[in-house]
């Protein structure tokens, strides 16, 4: 391994068809000519991606890592630790890469600004079936696409996990990815968390306007049911960031029971509303708050256990 390599890191778990599509588009976009190494980090104990990596060795430089523990952030930390001096472009296993993106990331790799910058580009969407118009406001940027508005500072909108890059040395310095977050864990929050830490260490986020990558969105990833599951996980994440140092009832702050009752009442009152958005909105608000309540109980329980063990 050279002192500084350019790595394209793809964490995957049991999605061979989508992974093949991603690698194929990397090859078509000229990843071999750009001098990058594709690293597939398969987590969850399976090795289904190993034959695919072997198959593409004649098309690009590609390496494979197998990890027993499940979790995207665990897989990405493994890549960071294995390629500690490298520049790492993080992609999801369900994206379509453009030639312009490959060229844009190669340029910033060659600039070698370790300890100064990290990078991200816009995200387009390859959608299997467009969602209902009213549902779009509840969908994450990974399902609707993202392009930094002109004049906005990049720190106001964190880069999406399907298309961003940083030097491994900078990620190691800030502690890497939080393995309690991300797909396989909470399902949300991993890239925002690590980018916050990079900014806290003094790095500047740089937007690569031409580095377009397209994210595949199947119909079940932009459905009301999927959005509600995500809202629950978002509630858990937000709950974990709040200090609940107040009187408790059954392991939870008392005011939460009052708020939960209010939200439950709103949901029940709209169960038969003719407006699907109104029905969904009250369900979303309730489910988000239930996730928040669950995390509050878990945190206080873990704090109590820690106190008991120390006695």
How would you name each of these model-derived features?
Residues 122, 138-157:
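Short, flexible, basic/aromatic active-site loop/helix in glycosyltransferases
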Residues 229-234, 245-311:
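Non-catalytic, C-terminal membrane-associated alpha-helical segments of glycosyltransferases
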